[in-house]
Amino acid sequence: MERFLRKYNISGDYANATRTFLAISPQWTCSHLKRNCLFNGMCVKQHFERAMIAATDAEEPAKAYKLVELAKEAMYDRETVWLQCFKSFSQPYEEDVEGKMKRCGAQLLEDYRKSGMMNEAVKQSALVNSERIRLDDSLSAMPYIYVPINDGQIVNPTFISRYRQIAYYFYNPDAADDWIDPNLFGIRGQHNQIKREVERQINTCPYTGYRGRVFQVMFLPIQLINFLRMDDFAKRFNRYASMAIQQYLRVGYAEEIRYVQQLFGRVPTGEFPLHQMMLMRRDLPTRDRSIVEARVRRSGDENWQSWLLPMIIIREGLDHQDRWEWFIDYMDRKHTCQLCYLKHSKQIPACSVIDVRASELTGCSPFKMVKIEEHVGNDSVFKTKLVRDEQIGRIGDHYYTTNCYTGAEALITTAIHIHRWIRGSGIWNDEGWQEGIFMLGRVLLRWELTKAQRSALLRLFCFVCYGYAPRADGTIPDWNNLGNFLDIILKGPELSEDEDERAYATMFEMVRCIITLCYAEKVHYAGFAAPACEGGEVINLAARMSQMWMEY
């Protein structure tokens, strides 16, 4: 391969096409209809490597360039390329897959330094909590910011606590007859008194040890209190509570409209659209008057998801009046996965998702109808059938497939997914890392990308492999800010032509190895032992990375 490319000075997109076609040629099925595939009676599409060797040995540049043109022409049909790649890579060969993965890893480690990603990792603040909680907009703790009242007075508390700067005010929901906006002038004095009293009685956060002022209040059902004593439950619920407060603090600012559109898919006219959507009187099949009342009056269980507001189900109710019953049923039965509920309980194969940020970056609509796939579990990414311009996405612990009509849209959609779900720590034997490489491979092979987009894709590959590896001082970079992350990925330096060619070869080989490895493990072909990642080699790469960090 390298001899052929260098001998005939083939570079750039033509070299990338030649590398790709060489890998899929053994499984290529050709009809020979155009007859342009036949050289001396041999189909070069099915025997590409033999034709390359023959053209190199015979020093026939005309044939060599014809081969390259055939490879480039084949790349125009990206759907066929993806299917042929998937078919070819899932077949085991007698090769050192493990060794090739390690060589790709070493090259990506070098690219991590040269691409500017390591410089950006140095600039990031240190991650305070290494157990990252993955949040998305499909669930919300927003109902708990609204003030429960009875005869115009705030309902008395039965217990108080705090999470950092947020006061937790526990009460009996049955004692309330309505819920109101916490900014209303008539209750500001009482609201401030609650904050002062919680700050006086509990000067240290029981979850984090934070000692500081209390600035906000969340009104929680007393039934929740025992579950907040469970570490994992509290950790996740507290993060959603914090996110709800951040959204509430944007009320009255320009960002409020973005938040409302992201959560509900529509923005009502008038002031304070967030409060309107939460407190508006709804025609619910129960006596509840608003979605806040419906949520607060229904207890969950030991699953933290069962206490939050299911935004996907709510959007179904907003779009179809008769589906408000689903909202009540979902909470009454304490479901935890909205996509499972739609797919299995309601036999709905598709639902709407909203991504305002991706819309702003690509110019496409923020609304997408997506096909509901399988719940997160063994092999679910690799078993998902992707056709035409589909790409995998994820809401909570459930996969879906969405249509991406351009390479830019596929790149940004995948980058947002990877930022939320994939953590590359330099040790690549977990399923999350394999999922990330698979998704990036789909973008690399299925869509026609520009050199700038492939440069961004390389930075994503580096992030998937090494983004959360410890720095020289042992701290882990904090990549939690999505806007900052996308700026680094999408606005980084563009690779030169030589760098682009080498990066494509590395990414292509890594994808090929991952698909081969995953399918070999599952199918158990006779005579092919699925390789495992050796700890010693991982340590060697980690040592090399440590040496690189010392330079910064």
UniProtKB/Swiss-Prot annotation:
Q: Which InterPro entries match?
A: Orbi_NS1
Assigned protein family: Belongs to the orbivirus non-structural protein NS1 family.
Q: In its UniProt entry, what is this protein called? A: Non-structural protein NS1
What is the protein's species of origin?
Answer: Bluetongue virus 11 (isolate USA)
Organism classification: Viruses, Riboviria, Orthornavirae, Duplornaviricota, Resentoviricetes
| Primary gene name | Segment-5
